[in-house]
Amino acid sequence: MDITFIDETEKVPTEEIKEIENLLQFAAGFLEIAEDTEMSVTFTDNAGIQMINRDYRGKDMPTDVISFALEDEGEDELPIIFDDEELAELPRNLGDLIISTERAAEQAVEYGHTLEREMGFLAVHGFLHLNGYDHMEPEDEKEMFGLQKEILDAYGLKR
């Protein structure tokens, strides 16, 4: 899977980005995602994610992670239509993850675990959203959170 990383904070160590990439590659293998799949991960601060949260979700407050799944159509969006031949030539693009490193650090302290664990959790959580999982209904939440724990535990990133 091809993952593009953008660090708007210019503070995320290269080793941490590599670790998140390894975790997301592991999660992609776990879900049997095709190798020619693409996605992006952007690291921002609370002000940056608050602006995105306000503009796209109508919530004027910072949050930890936002996922923009390209395969999900919004209510007022028209579908992008390709014929099968065109579609076969294009890599699958899951979409974009935006993670607030500030919020991740705050939550790591709140939950009593490492920043590495919190960043990994948020990356996998957002990755599952990009792949169609959600937690709006109790049964969906159970499935998504169970899968999230399974991936993190199998990778070795436990609480």
UniProtKB/Swiss-Prot annotation:
UniProt source species: Enterococcus faecalis (strain ATCC 700802 / V583)
Positions bound to Zn(2+): 125, 129, 135
Record field: transmembrane: none
GO molecular function: metalloendopeptidase activity; RNA endonuclease activity; zinc ion binding
Keyword set includes Nuclease: yes
Role of this protein: Single strand-specific metallo-endoribonuclease involved in late-stage 70S ribosome quality control and in maturation of the 3' terminus of the 16S rRNA.
Keywords: Cytoplasm, Endonuclease, Hydrolase, Metal-binding, Nuclease, Ribosome biogenesis, rRNA processing, Zinc
PANTHER family, per the entry: ENDORIBONUCLEASE YBEY, CHLOROPLASTIC
Cofactor list: Zn(2+)
Subcellular localization, as worded in the UniProt entry: Cytoplasm
Protein name: Endoribonuclease YbeY
UniProt gene name: ybeY
Enzyme Commission no: 3.1.-.-
Upper classification of the organism: Bacteria, Bacillati, Bacillota, Bacilli, Lactobacillales
